[in-house]
């Protein structure tokens, strides 16, 4: 299966998603339920466009080499510096082909087999986290359960379930505070204080990653809370209209974190060249979400392998043509903003 065949197979299988040749947010706009962004739908488009505006500085005067795309992270070795991002409420947003449990049962082992890992989603149905953690446990802990910012008791319960899976890291998408189903809950859910996050990070038992950081101030608070990593993310434009693109804020966040935590970024990253750009701007790794949904719906495990190898080959090609033999060699002067 090649990528064009994957897209063709996915069309008509994903509810309102059209499995576009380029997943740039324009066709789905503000379609929620569905894969679109909130309100005007322009934040997802801005995410994509921002990476297009970063250009690559080609330099082929160097020794011949085979690029080393491997990433060392939290005691694990990955084939590539990118991960499948967390996606949930599959039936609501993508039709009835897969529910969350079925989706994760395909995604988690397929990512592990491809040499990367999947962040898994969470939901109001307890079976979502149960299914995700079961899939991670069955694959040697090769996955990152992502817990929503529920009330403290619910967070503690779900994190305990996540730890039992043997996961190598655990995440919370704090930006999910903007999702309607988390608002007006009793007990309160959504935003967390630094003190609450400190407690969650202490109780995690494994490296704790906080997803949904969009300002230098927010990054500093996350570091003060003791997180092992942050994800620069605006939730794919699905929680706050008119916010900036992740690429636009990444450099200032990297600067303030200053190596005290790992920095991931997502939002509109669609090619291996985009992965390279993110690393050149200071990210340690990236998350890719919507395209992995298309991969699962279009080809199951084979689709996940197809997309992963496509992104990996593009990354290696970019490294070769910009003079970076390994990820550590990717530097700011290799891109033009």
Where on the chain are the PLM-derived regions?
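Long, hydrophobic, well-ordered secondary-structure blocks that form the structural core
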Residues: 117, 127-153
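Alpha/beta enzyme core
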Residues: 108-109, 137-138, 150-265, 272-296, ...
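Conserved active-site and cofactor/substrate-binding residues in soluble primary-metabolism enzymes
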Residues: 38-46, 102, 106, 153, ...
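Conserved active-site-proximal phosphate/metal-binding subdomains
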Residues: 1-26, 237-262, 270-337
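An N-cap/entry alpha-helix motif that binds or orients negatively charged groups
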Residues: 2-79, 330
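N-terminal functional module of multi-domain proteins
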Residues: 43-129
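Flexible, glycine/proline-enriched loop segments at strand-loop-helix junctions
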Residues: 94, 119-121, 143-150, 182-188
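Generic secondary-structure signature for well-ordered alpha-helical cores
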Residues: 49-57, 112, 116, 164-167, ...
